[in-house]
């Protein structure tokens, strides 16, 4: 799997606007994982991104257009969701998803 370099740059710019601090990216699952310290909160793929959510945010997130459970190997992976590129075509939407990912690092519940 590859990743969308344009979406990665937009995500890094959005994280800077959020004042997220030092975020790095590295290869994970064939995507570019966004890391805060040694913990991943999102990853950019070729036509979607995955985001880790707080458990309490998961049910509402799954009702949004372009969002589904992240299911590598056919089974849902914890509180991770997959968000299509269309669902993050606007920068405010992208920032909202990245902010949700960062919240999951502070409190998983």
Please name every model-derived segment.
Residues 1-109:
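Charge-dense, helix-prone N-terminal extensions
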């Amino acid at each position: 799997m590859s990743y969308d370099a344009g979406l990665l740059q937009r995500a890094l710019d959005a994280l800077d606007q959020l004042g997220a601090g030092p975020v790095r990216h590295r290869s994970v699952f064939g995507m570019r994982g966004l890391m805060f310290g040694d913990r991943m909160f999102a990853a950019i793929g070729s036509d979607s991104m995955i985001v880790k959510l707080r458990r309490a945010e998961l049910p509402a997130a799954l009702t949004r257009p372009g969002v589904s459970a992240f299911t590598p190997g056919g089974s849902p992976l914890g509180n991770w969701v997959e968000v299509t590129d269309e669902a993050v075509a606007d920068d405010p939407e992208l920032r909202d998803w990245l902010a949700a990912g960062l919240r999951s690092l502070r409190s998983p519940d």
